[in-house]
Regions:
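Cysteine-nucleophile active-site neighborhood
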Residues: 148-234, 240-245
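C-terminal lobe/tail of nucleotide-utilizing enzymes
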Residues: 14, 21-128, 132-139, 193, ...
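A short helix->loop->beta-strand "cap" motif at the edges of active sites that frequently abuts
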Residues: 7, 66, 171-175
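Inter-motif core of Ras-like GTPase G domains
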Residues: 1-15
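Short glycine-/small-residue-rich Rossmann-like dinucleotide-binding loops
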Residues: 143-147
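Receiver (REC) domain switch-region micro-motif
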Residues: 9, 41, 142
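Short glycine-/polar-rich loops that comprise or flank the Walker A/P-loop
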Residues: 5-9, 36-38, 204
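Short amphipathic alpha-helical segments and helix-helix/interface helices
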Residues: 2, 57-60, 116-117, 154, ...
Length: 352
């Protein structure tokens, strides 16, 4: 991407993993001529005495002819979303200690897993990423997330018997939520006539929703506005008809019992004035293509209060703004950068 854009590059290395200088040096050498785009280094997540690190900084600068323009200290609980799913690879991850247990099925090819970070700012939620049948079967809400390869993840989920665990959770009264690729998995069938995602042309879904999905050769990518239109009072009391914001990024189109939400696509294939149906609900399960739906504070609190009601707990007021929490976290990161990074160097390589 940097080569296509003709952009300068700063190489960032996390020192807490070990071997940071070897990693930086090796990357520059392996890139060959393209390595000339790398203008400097940032050392990230440093703990300890900077004077002890200085010989290493001098060494990498002398060996590659590029400066280290900053050493960022390790900042615990910065409050920003994880960069990728590496944090989920070491088995079960659980954060929070609330009364509402939410389990996200940790698919092998999970995507957009930060969709569920907003739950971490709620005082009554325990959020867990897991493939444990016991965790899934005893959750108050199970989320089937998006996937980079929906068909493969669906087949792997079935091979592990987690389809049975999800149904057990539903039969015990848990709410099942399916987002994007998870929404496609939750339907009756997935058709892949062009073999976009696999060599399997047709696969049975989980049968939780009355929809079928067909993969085409084009991808939907757009921001959306939405409102609940299908049985809103029964589906989610307290946010009837409220406007929601999010985005779509998926292959495939679904058909069937669709119309839980009415959406307007703000970019991509349709004009803002065009309203389209999205989402489906049946029994204790609902699903949608809308990523970022839980960043809508009133909607998120409404979902949680419905779960509290089922547990015999009083509702909580919606006093948490996820957007404001993210902005404060970004401000803290900006303060760290101003304090520990040569911003003047960055401006110079950008020609500012």
């Amino acid at each position: 991407a940097a080569k296509l854009a003709g952009a300068p590059v700063l190489l960032v290395g996390d020192i807490d993993k070990g071997g940071v200088f070897a990693s930086l040096y090796g990357t520059v050498k392996l890139l060959g001529r393209d390595g000339r785009r790398i203008k400097g280094y940032l050392i990230n997540k440093f703990r300890g005495d900077l004077d002890i690190l200085k010989p290493g900084l001098d060494m990498i600068e002398a060996a590659t002819g590029r400066p280290v323009i900053g050493v960022l200290p390790y900042a615990a609980d910065l409050g920003l979303p994880e960069e990728d799913s590496l944090s989920l690879r070491n088995g079960t991850m659980s954060r929070g200690d609330g009364t509402i247990r939410i389990v996200v099925v940790r698919l092998r090819y999970i995507s957009n897993f930060t969709d569920f970070d907003p739950f971490l700012c709620e005082p009554d939620v325990q959020l867990q990423y897991s493939v444990s049948p016991a965790d899934i079967e005893n959750a108050d809400m199970v989320i089937i997330p998006g996937s980079k390869n929906t068909v493969k993840d669906l087949l792997l989920l079935k091979d592990a018997g987690l389809d049975r665990s999800i149904r057990t959770a539903r039969d015990r009264g848990a709410r099942i939520v399916a987002i994007c690729g998870g929404y496609q998995m939750a339907g009756r069938k997935i058709y892949d006539p062009h073999f976009v995602e696999s060599t399997v042309g047709e696969v049975n879904g989980l049968g939780l929703l009355d929809i079928e999905t067909t993969f085409g050769e084009t991808k939907t990518t757009c921001q959306v506005e939405a409102k609940i239109v299908q049985r809103p009072a029964a589906f989610l009391p307290g946010v009837d008809g409220g406007e929601l914001k999010g985005y779509e990024i998926h292959m495939g189109e679904s058909r069937g019992d669709i119309g839980l939400f009415e959406i307007r696509r703000l970019s991509g294939q349709a004009l803002p004035s065009v309203s389209l149906p999205d989402g489906s609900a049946r029994d204790h399960c609902w699903g949608t293509y809308i990523h970022g739906i839980f960043e809508n504070d009133a909607f998120r609190r409404g979902v949680l209060n419905r779960l509290r009601e089922k547990k015999g707990l009083a509702p909580l007021p919606g006093s948490v703004s996820y957007t404001e929490m993210k902005e404060r976290a970004l401000d803290r990161l900006a303060d760290l950068l101003r304090l520990h990074v040569d911003i003047g160097f960055i401006r110079r390589i950008l020609g500012l």
